[in-house]
Amino acid sequence: MSRIGRMPVVIPAGVTVQVADNNVVTVKGPLGTLEKQLPERMTITVDGNQALVTRPTDEKEDRSLHGLTRALLQDMVIGVSEGYKKVLMIIGVGYKAVKQGNNLLLYLGHSLMPVTGMPQERFIISDTPTVKLEVPTEDEIKKQGIDKMTTEKVSTSLIIVVRGIDKQEVGQMAAVIRGKRPPEPYHGKGVRYIEENVRRRVGKTGK
């Protein structure tokens, strides 16, 4: 991780990085603003279009924190400039997803299950959301190239796009949705990441 830590973080045009007391870092870009407190033992300096992270010692813990801090800062810069996206696919007869207000409603073969466990504002669709949930139309699926990301047949209401500027929160939200009904190994029914390869099992045969 120390090798990664030594690499400067390139700050693209339109993005600003500010470092305050206690290593509270604010990164602003065209997609929004992120603020996080990074490990205080590291020193973060901004010089022109680069941000550099340095460590106080070569101790094992500092080397580890060095790479981690640099990676977190890089994720923030990418988030506000390019954003992050996770695409999930629903497989199963009668299964579907419906965007209703701030909630994503999943019909997965049993009771209606609104995704919960996270602040409601993360489901609000706005110009600069932290996390945005989408159920794209067929035209949007083709425009975004989602139909080319898998060999499975895809259609609207069977695709969920989780989009946002915070890499960790996008991944966590996608995991929450997938966890509502993970793909089962016999028929592959359930919610999976679109690039996920589900290992199938052969069911028992009658004698």
Model regions and ranges:
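N-terminal intrinsically disordered, cationic/polar leader segments
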Residues: 2-66, 70-78, 82-207
